[in-house]
Amino acid sequence: MNPEHSPLGKATVYAAQYDASLLFPIPRAGAREQLGITSALPFFGTDIWNAYELSWLNARGKPQVAIATFYVPAESPNIVESKSFKLYLGSFAQSKFDSVDAVRDVLKRDVSAACGASVSVQLVSPHDFAKLEMDELDGLSLDRLDLDTDVYEPDPSLLSAADGENEAPVEETLVSDLLRSNCPVTGQPDWGSVQIHYVGPQIDHAGLLRYIISFRNHTGFHEQCVERIFLDILHACKPVKLAVYARYTRRGGLDINPFRTNYNQPMPDNARTARQ
């Protein structure tokens, strides 16, 4: 299914009852082919979706609320278009479920079917809300650099690294809050923070910041932007190990946080940043 056929940018009709058919899958293959990925993926990882506007009725008709987190594997053939996800979650509001577990099971079944892979689902009930953490991405801030730039479309030529043959490899974690891209259907801006961890030739910090800023006028879904960043750094700077994690601010009650890596490491924390 193409994004142009999704609910984005169209008049919205809110479902009165639970409706799994509202989920609109978008194949990852098209965007990945544009990046030169036609066979085995050069990374693995997860898309972490947090849903803050989930409510349903219990068996006696009393409203219940929860925060839902979905872990979508990067190898899934599809992503779910975000507005369709919002409408799908909204369809739970006037539907009765016997338990929290029943809601979780339905969410897992439906979203897994739309993505074409097993999706993990966690629900946090109100009595656990106080346990949820808020934190910023850890690392050395690239935003400390005072520099000029005038490139606002992705340009991997901005990236460079030290000569790997003549200098020892380094291990660094770098972060920036200056990531912005735009929805390919509506043109609405998507604001994010990005964390880049690598082992290899030292990456030029100023060039990396200019590269991140260069996404400012780019149109692409969150997941596609992170994969482009990962591949451009991998090809231009040739790190031995690389991980890219972005946390985007929420829209429509959802935030999307893609993570891509080429080496085994723990799942990143799902702590909200201040802007989220």
Swiss-Prot record:
Kindly indicate whether the keyword Oxidoreductase belongs to this entry: yes
Active site per the UniProt annotation: C183, D190
Question: What GO annotations for molecular function exist for this entry?
Answer: preQ1 synthase activity
Binding residue positions for NADPH = S82, K83, R251, G252
Q: Which UniProt keywords apply?
A: Cytoplasm, NADP, Oxidoreductase, Queuosine biosynthesis
Enzyme class, first EC level, given as a word: oxidoreductase
Detail which positions bind substrate.
V80, E81, S82, H222, E223
Q: Has UniProt tagged this entry with the keyword DNA-binding?
A: no
List the catalysed reactions.
7-aminomethyl-7-carbaguanine + 2 NADP(+) = 7-cyano-7-deazaguanine + 2 NADPH + 3 H(+)
Quick one: which pathway? tRNA modification; tRNA-queuosine biosynthesis
The principal localisation class reads: cytoplasm
Pfam families referenced in this protein's UniProt entry, alphabetically? QueF, QueF_N
Q: Where in the cell is it found?
A: Cytoplasm
Q: Which GO terms describe its cellular component?
A: cytoplasm
Under the heading InterPro entries, the entry gives: GTP-CH-I_C/QueF (IPR043133), NADPH_dep_7-cyano-7-deazaG_red (IPR050084), QueF (IPR029500), QueF_N (IPR029139), QueF_type2 (IPR016428)
Give the family per the record.
Answer: Belongs to the GTP cyclohydrolase I family. QueF type 2 subfamily.
The name under which this protein is listed is NADPH-dependent 7-cyano-7-deazaguanine reductase
Q: Which gene encodes it?
A: queF
